[in-house]
Amino acid sequence: MAKAKLERTKPHMNIGTIGHIDHGKTTLTAAITKVLHDRYPELNKATPFDKIDKAPEEKARGITISIAHVEYQTEKRHYAHVDCPGHADYVKNMITGAAQMDGAILVVAATDGPMPQTKEHVLLARQVGVPYIVVALNKADMVDDEEILELVELEVRELLSAQEFPGDDLPVVRVSALKALEGDEKWADSIIELMNAVDENIPEPPRDTDKPFLMPIEDVFSITGRGTVVTGRIERGVVKVNEQVDIIGIKSEKTTTTVTSIEMFNKMLDEGHAGDNAALLLRGIKREQVERGQCIIKPGTTTPHTEFEAQVYILSKDEGGRHTPFFNNYRPQFYFRTTDVTGVVNLPEGTEMVMPGDNTEMTVQLIQPIAMEEGLKFAIREGGRTVGAGRVTKILK
């Protein structure tokens, strides 16, 4: 077994537990760490329940969220797992993406079946782009009637299908987190079965370097005799010297140019990768043709838009947000990547106003186009102060 220590090549995945309050998300998280620790002691340490339950508060863009992070390994993979103690913490985490999830374990108590927060979490998972779900039907030891278990399973599958997840096909594993924590061998096996389902059914996400090149522009300056240089952190993909790129966003027309040189820390590079803070020299571009807030992209891979639907969390007064509600036609700034753009908010029918601390859907019309795709995160600001955070759920124009 000593060999396992040396394996650093395991794929790394981010997952989390979602579901209704008191259905056993935190107990399940603790049970996973315990059972994997018992089976693979040299790979895992057990994290006790109370340590997960008293999750530290984090600030993501000024929003206070309690999140517990645990890590563990199966034979195949290394997992970072997030669990939020409170319902509001989930909503905030999912909308702001404070902890990104490549997949989720939906915990449903067999004794209750799907409850209101089960639905809300699944809806949010769909909207914010959590791509895969595996179901843990928890407290299965407390239901003796096989028919009831089958009915609850059917209900969960229907709920998932209604939100466009493959409800008929995804795995539903019957577990008892509490019994597994107490050391019951049969139910410990159910946790292993659950993790096998996660290993097999939550695929690895594409790596950032495999996605098409995109770099938000942070700064622009001209170097005498050489031309115009733009700097920024490459968000995804790879760019090579002498490749053609498009500059899009903010202005109505795109600009096409060639990257003639790439530098990082004043050293010349042949290519820039996702995560690099790079300076790109652009051929035939004048200083005034580009500005902060635009994006440099692989031609044709992303388009600028002005109108979209979003799921948004509005900061509470305690988090430094607004003290008063806002109404239809609210006009704050929307901060995308590196810049603010003013937009007009349209609230969904039946929503008169939005209070600080609420989450809501909205439609936004920006006064300038921004390079965007579904899932893009933004902050809502008033005079430089963050009052909300959101994600694009659908592009309209």
Curated annotation (Swiss-Prot):
Residues 10-206 form the tr-type G domain. GTP binds at residues 19-26, 83-87, 138-141. Residues 19-26 are annotated as: G1. GO terms for cellular component: cytosol. Its EC number is 3.6.5.3. It is found in: Cytoplasm. Residues 62-66 are annotated as: G2. SUPFAM superfamilies: EF-Tu/eEF-1alpha/eIF2-gamma C-terminal domain (SSF50465), P-loop containing nucleoside triphosphate hydrolases (SSF52540), Translation proteins (SSF50447). Mg(2+) binds at residue 26. CDD domains: EF_Tu, EFTU_II, EFTU_III. It catalyses: GTP + H2O = GDP + phosphate + H(+). Keywords: Cytoplasm, Elongation factor, GTP-binding, Hydrolase, Magnesium, Metal-binding, Nucleotide-binding, Protein biosynthesis. One of its GO terms (molecular function) is translation elongation factor activity. It comes from the Bacteria. Residues 83-86 are annotated as: G3. Residues 138-141 are annotated as: G4. Residues 176-178 are annotated as: G5. GTP hydrolase that promotes the GTP-dependent binding of aminoacyl-tRNA to the A-site of ribosomes during protein biosynthesis. Totally resistant to GE2270A and kirromycin, but sensitive to pulvomycin. Belongs to the TRAFAC class translation factor GTPase superfamily. Classic translation factor GTPase family. EF-Tu/EF-1A subfamily. Monomer. HAMAP family: EF_Tu_B. This is Elongation factor Tu. It comes from Planobispora rosea. The gene is tuf.
